[in-house]
C-alpha cells in the first residue's frame, strides 16, 4: 500500500523526518485505516525505505510503502451482551430446567468469523452454552460455579479464566462456535452474562 504523508505547515525537516522514521520502526503488523472507509482497517507493516520531498518553506511530504499481511480487511469489533436468567443467587432445585434465550447476530463482510466469548456465571452451578442453530457449532463450558469467569477465543482455541473451576478429560469444554455471513440464530443456555465479540472480515 503506497502512502503519502503531507505536511502543509510548521515542517521542521530533520526533526519531523526522524519522528516519522521512529513511528515507522515498530515491529510486527498494525491496523491502519483511511478517512474514506473509517470502519475498515488493514493489518500492515512498514516495508522498504521512505523518501522525503520539501520546498524549504515548512512544507513537504513523505512517500512510504506498507505491506499487507493478507488479502483481507477488517471491520470494527462488535460486542453483543446478553443476560440469561437472573443475576441473583438461587437456593432452589438444582435440577430445574436451565434458563434459555435466543439472540440473533447479523454478520457483515465476506468471510465467516470465529468470535471471542466472555462468560460470567450467575445462579446455581451448571453448564453454560452458546449454540449457533444455523451451523450447529457452539461454545459449551460444563459445570461452572457461581462467579466463574471465562474468555474463550474460538479462533485460537484458547481459554482464559478467573476462577478455580478445572475441566477434566470427561468434562472438557467445546469451543468451535462460528458465525456465518448474514443472520445467525444463537441459543443461550444457563444463567450468565455472555458477551460475544466479533469482527467483520472483507476479502479485497
Language-model-detected regions and their locations in the chain:
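Oligomerization/assembly interface segments of phage tail-like spikes and tubes
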Residues: 1-11, 58-72, 184
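Compositionally biased, low-complexity regions
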Residues: 2-27, 31
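Hydrophobic side chains in beta-strands
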Residues: 5, 34, 46, 68, ...
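"Short basic amphipathic alpha-helical interaction patches in structured regions
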Residues: 15-24, 61-62, 78-82
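Short, surface-exposed linear patches
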Residues: 23-28, 54-56, 67, 85-90, ...
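A generic structural signal for short, non-catalytic loop/turn and secondary-structure boundary residues
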Residues: 25, 35-39, 57-59, 110, ...
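Short beta-strand and beta-hairpin "edge-sheet" elements
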Residues: 29-74
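Intrinsically disordered, low-complexity segments enriched in serine, threonine, and glycine
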Residues: 76-204
